[in-house]
């Protein structure tokens, strides 16, 4: 991040509007948001709320119809696009669509080869990252022999290999089974706690959003709420407008007599065992 101004947001959107060429209304309508450096922000919303459009605008994949986007204090435009995209890594919903290499090792190596990293250094990076995501025993494995969760972990390792300052997780758990989802969320949590990255999670999953430092809620292309995850998720009006479900633990706790509603699994178990 630039040292010129430590208060500069890592990402800033100013009055951003976006309309698809085939659309009749704005997918994003006058959205202004700041993303602090080093924080984990979850963006919640139903299908069609504009959250995935937002992620693609931040990544420079879509150009706003109007409004401005700044990455690390620099305006995102044609002349700065390539430089700023090097600061951003994005992991998409379908793990099959982003596996480029013939094997796990090849996939992690792909971006490093493009950056002309020396082979010896590359080997060390691949081994280190594959261990961190729990895939070091599968380096010679082909993608068709991996589960969805394993493929997403490889995708995360491939992004980490490029060492971007910003990582966007775009519905990364929506196509995974419960085991795969748990593995990926654990990995995101580890990145949040141990790496100085600005993380953005695009999701409709409240169990994922509750891990974040901050939650933004979109509905019909507009920002309708922003704040602490627990406060946002307790706001039934916001939840209803956004058409999203409360986390499983919270729903269970609300059904139990003499138990205060909670999002904390350990706290719920403690209340039940009293």
UniProtKB/Swiss-Prot annotation:
SMART domains: AAA. Its EC number is 7.-.-.-. The keyword ATP-binding applies. The keyword Membrane applies. It is found in: Cell membrane. ATP binds at residues 45-52. Keywords: ATP-binding, Cell membrane, Membrane, Nucleotide-binding, Translocase, Transport. Pfam families: ABC_tran (PF00005). Belongs to the ABC transporter superfamily. Energy-coupling factor EcfA family. PANTHER family: ENERGY-COUPLING FACTOR TRANSPORTER ATP-BINDING PROTEIN ECFA1, HEAVY METAL TRANSPORTER. This is Energy-coupling factor transporter ATP-binding protein EcfA1. It comes from Mycoplasma mobile (strain ATCC 43663 / 163K / NCTC 11711) (Mesomycoplasma mobile). The gene is ecfA1.
